[in-house]
């Protein structure tokens, strides 16, 4: 285990222990200095969330495990308590700055203030979206938490699982009440979203109780616990099945009935403006996700310009490679490219292994070049693995999970290999660079390497920063690293990936600010990206239930590129891209305006 990470993990455990035991009066009541105050708020926030404490994996099955049999209530009272906590924390932050702070402390204060202000701003809306969707909500999050996160390393851990299973039944009742209240206040999801939710709810209750994942996952994990006998394991499984049948499945059936009623009451309008305060909710979502003051109109216009620029570059490559005719729609020319020999790996075990080997070769080439372009090359290894087969139906084409805080797990790029045709050879280089190095893997590993700052700085997640960096990395791999030299089709893959994010700017704002329909959004995305219709349908339905989130990627990339151009103009021949990357990465995630201030400060201080 990395020594610094080991110390960080020990520090987190110690902070939580202090909070649980009340061992430090000064920690709770009069923290000395900003960093101690931020750590106090971070720990208090963790203590409010049993799921977060379990996810950290620090205290479960220890003497300080007070949380391992609990779940956070899904009630308005719990929401109000969380809002009150955040408002009090924000008031307290003003006692520590920003006056008199310099360097990292001033940056820490600004990041913390932005995060707290954003949460308070979102809390203005009691009904700011849809509580249950195909991607989010307790019916998505809690089954995954119970089966994948809750630890079962002892008989006690299994008993606590049963307690949480009972609590899940209570939360389903709370969800039923809250979705019904939302409906009564005019908050109804579009009909196509209700159908997706119904599909998932019905699939959840379809299995026989004895074969249900909430029972079988317990059985599977108990097999690895030597201290639990076969008799004890059988009894624990029996109890889990009983709770499932008596508490959980009835809750799901109530939600099914409620959503069947919703389906008769709703319509197909896609945008968030369909609900009360929808325009204000969308403006707040854009501010939160992009971390800027850009309006929906600004973002829509930006997207249209980027789509036209990228389309022209893609057409030039297709023309040069003799793929299709200029008069053909882009989607048809992309389909013709995919039919070329060698572009699709065989959909066999051997073909899947060959695809992973190809991705590994791309990663190794990037890592050989990285020291010439980065002062700090993260030491954390990266693994390339397939999405588990049982998850691949509902999983995206690929995604990245960062290294463990304690260094026990490497960064991992998961690629969905259900159908190798989903990822043609010409798209793989940009995909690997975005999710791996120097994209998300460098950015996530850099955050773990920051020293002398509160834990919040290592844990902070800003979509515009993280996704903006990954898109910047795709372009930098071409302009700085030369990774697409002699590979025009690989460069086409990079442009298609960027086009996908640019089209999102148009579609997200079209849906939520311009009255676009689901079908209009799907047609626009297919026309301009050439991606498969089924994949685009899933994407558009994601934008419908997560307003604003999809705009952060391209906004972030363009902001970082603009910061670089500004620094190059100021410094001229003194500009060093390695130093620029160090400034952007080695302070961790932050809002884009703060990142720009950081870059300008670096330029001003540059010799």
Give each language-model segment a name.
Residues 9-607:
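N-terminal maturation segment of proteins
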Residues 1-6, 419:
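Short, Lys/Arg-rich N-terminal segment immediately upstream of the first membrane anchor
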